[in-house]
Amino acid sequence: MRTKQDFINALSKMKRNIYYDGQLIDRTDELQSDCINVMGTTYDEAAKPENEVLMTATSHLTGQKINRFTHIHQNTTDLHRKQDMTRMLCQKVGGCIQRCMGIDGTNAIYNVSFEADKVKPGETNYHENFKKWLTRFQKEDMIAACAQTDTKGDRMLRPAEQPDPSAYVRIKERTKDGIIVEGCKLHISEASVSDEVLVIPTRALRKEDKDYAVAFAVPADYDGMKQVVTIHNYRQREHFKRGFTPGLTDSYLIFDNCFVPWERVFLAGEHLYGGVLALLFALFHRHSYSGCKPAIGDVILGTAALAAECNNVHKESHVREKLAELIMTIELGYAAGYTASDLGKPEVYIPGMGFVPFGPGSYIPNSIYCNVGRCLSGEAVWREAEILCDIAGGVVATFPHEKDFVNPDVGPALLKYTKRNPKMSAEDQAQFWRYLGDSMCSATGGIANVGNYHGGGSPIMEQIAITTQYDIESRKKLVKFIAGMSGGDREALAPKVKK
């Protein structure tokens, strides 16, 4: 396994294909340093002996010790540890750990490539291609961005109906050596600090959309792909540094007649599996959210409690009620993810068929509980922000800049007049309000809230998944029996025992 410095050294050797604010930049540009430090945490923590069980695994391909972020889940224990690893790391960086796209993308492709090879037995080699790619990915402890979201063009038209065929990433041409693709993937988190980019479909596809059923991997500095990155950093401080300063990036990935050799292609035209891959990545990513969002909730809870303490209202009953509400949201989201892990099996939900065996045997979290947990947590994002705003008051929006506090003309007076709790130092109170201003009243803080709401799938997507997969009809039959109506069935929800 590599170190954080190995990771940075690898970034420094990559070709320049990243545009920021109109200019080409290096991956190790200072603007990306906060994001790199977040990603680097996944290497620093994996090297600690106390984190070995949580952060490392044994590769089922090579038998070697690997970083868990490169692992394919082999049992429910792996699913539990992935959730707990994600929560632990997100706590340490105060937000998104950024590396989950890779583990979620690899687990989805691992399963779908196996099934897609059954469409034309002997004619495709998707699964073996992916296993070869994955072996190197694990051995070199690499980071992968997962590029799913297409530009989509006219939202009322399907991919093959678009006036611009590149509104969704598509196979433009097939050759004996590979495929040529064009299109753009957007909102791609941390592609600017990744070694590889995994590309997968974004939606269900029909037969006429088969050219859009494509999955492949390319190096993040690959010829034929350009990145346009947006970098999200908090305001830099000169005098009153944070304990840890996270940063985020997201990229538009432009594929311009990009050639991909067959050995890096994991799906090419099997339209039914394009939709399955889109949904399966979303499922794994929502499972990651059940570790990520509780950790962010832990940070929000601590922030709300400290805001109340700084304001010296921490003993008031309305504060206790709000803290209890935060705790319930945190732990319900985690509990749903825990249950999804515990009920994980090598199976997926297929409409009209229910849960069926899927893939070569790796474990997939239960989709109902993944979606329930993600939806509950996602819908709570703005309520959590409201609670912080309510407890903090207006000071968070109007707090003076740090250099005012070191100006001898006004600094001492500012410390005096911003102190609220006589039992807490004025310096600590000022430092807290600076931190909360970063979280609540900055562009990056706003972006984080939007990401927490939409990341892994907007709540409406979870609601669709829940209502299509949940057995509502059996509940109706049970109630018909209880009510004395025709068509009732007292045993509608009784456990089905296999003989």
Predicted regions and their residues:
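Acidic/polar, glycine-rich intrinsically disordered N-terminal extensions of enzymes
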Residues: 1-59
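Generic structural signal for well-ordered, non-transmembrane alpha-helical segments
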Residues: 33, 37-40, 135-138, 295-298, ...
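A structural signal for well-ordered alpha-helices, especially hydrophobic packing surfaces
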Residues: 39, 43-46, 308, 330, ...
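Glycine-rich flavin
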Residues: 57-196, 202-216, 221, 226
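FAD-binding core of flavoproteins
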Residues: 146, 151-292, 473, 477-498
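Extended amphipathic alpha-helical segments enriched in small hydrophobics
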Residues: 288-347
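Short, charged, amphipathic alpha-helical segments
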Residues: 320-324, 357-371
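Alpha-helix capping/hinge segments and adjacent helical runs
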Residues: 368-498
